């Protein structure tokens, strides 16, 4: 990952955790 991907990866990861948390 690099550039925007580097910033989006943790965001998507957090969203994934929230979805699985539900």
From Swiss-Prot:
Main location: secreted
Keywords: Amphibian defense peptide, Secreted
Signal peptide: none
Function: Lacks antimicrobial activity. Does not inhibit the formation of NO by neuronal nitric oxide.
Name assigned to this protein: Rothein 2.1
GO CC entries: extracellular region
Localization per record: Secreted
């Amino acid at each position: 990952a690099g550039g925007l991907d580097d910033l989006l990866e943790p965001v998507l990861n957090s969203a994934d955790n929230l979805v699985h948390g539900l």
